UniProtKB/Swiss-Prot annotation:
Domain of life: Bacteria
Described purpose of this protein according to its UniProt entry: Catalyzes the formation of 6,7-dimethyl-8-ribityllumazine by condensation of 5-amino-6-(D-ribitylamino)uracil with 3,4-dihydroxy-2-butanone 4-phosphate. This is the penultimate step in the biosynthesis of riboflavin.
InterPro entries: LS, LS/RS, LS/RS_sf
Family from the record: Belongs to the DMRL synthase family.
Higher taxonomy: Bacteria, Pseudomonadati, Campylobacterota, Epsilonproteobacteria, Campylobacterales
This protein's encoding gene: ribH
Protein name: 6,7-dimethyl-8-ribityllumazine synthase
Gene Ontology annotations for the cellular component aspect, listed alphabetically: cytosol; riboflavin synthase complex
Amino acid sequence: MRIIEGKLQLQGNEKVAILTSRFNHIITDRLKEGAMDCFKRHGGDEDLLDIVLVPGAYELPFILERLLGSGKYDGVCVLGAIIRGGTPHFDYVSAEATKGIAHAMLKYSMPVSFGVLTTDNIEQAIERAGSKAGNKGFEAMSTLIELLSLCQTLKG
């Protein structure tokens, strides 16, 4: 029996994008910083890292499809923060963003990591953006790095 898994190390020649929504920027800026830190710590070349900003989480899938379809990137780390309010808006945005991101990843068969927070309140978002619960941006980039490595291994 063989176990095949990715490594948490970049080769240094991977072209990666961090796609981040600006809405709830107090949270998404911290997620983005965590992802950038992870990329650098695990052998990424900053010159091969692009940061792409969109207004909100609903726009993430549209631009993700553009990035993946461009052929310029080996993978994309998607970040955002959708915080529940008093209307059903949260449910619609979180569902459509999630479905759209998954659809784009499968359509292009390329590594995409999901670092979009969906929380009930701002406190939960803060906890997941670098305090009690770690930094989910860092974790999302870790996932992308492992996926990139695994795809390389599976190529042979």
